[in-house]
């Protein structure tokens, strides 16, 4: 859960959480939960999730297919 009482922005907390989960293998190559599901799970707004997903894309951890969702990329 993202903590709103910390000085670190919620989107950065979410990036850190999702990065740890991806690197730990919690999410294998394949689809991530929907934006709506991530909002509910982490108690954040849509814009926060979208910003976090953009940073994960920029880092090469995920890719997004229009109208399909975001996916964990294959890690070689």
Where are these regions (language model features)?
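Minor-groove-contacting beta-hairpin "wing" of winged helix-turn-helix DNA-binding domains
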Residues: 68-74
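Extreme N-terminal segment that seeds HTH/winged-HTH DNA-binding domains in transcriptional regulators
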Residues: 1-63, 74-75
């Amino acid at each position: 859960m993202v903590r709103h009482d910390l000085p670190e922005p919620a989107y950065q907390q979410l990036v850190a959480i999702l990065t740890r989960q991806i690197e730990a293998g919690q999410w294998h190559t394949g689809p991530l939960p929907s934006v709506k599901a991530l909002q509910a799970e982490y108690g954040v707004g849509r814009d926060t999730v979208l910003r976090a997903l953009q940073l994960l894309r920029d880092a090469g951890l995920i890719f997004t297919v229009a109208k399909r969702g975001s996916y964990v990329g294959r890690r070689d």
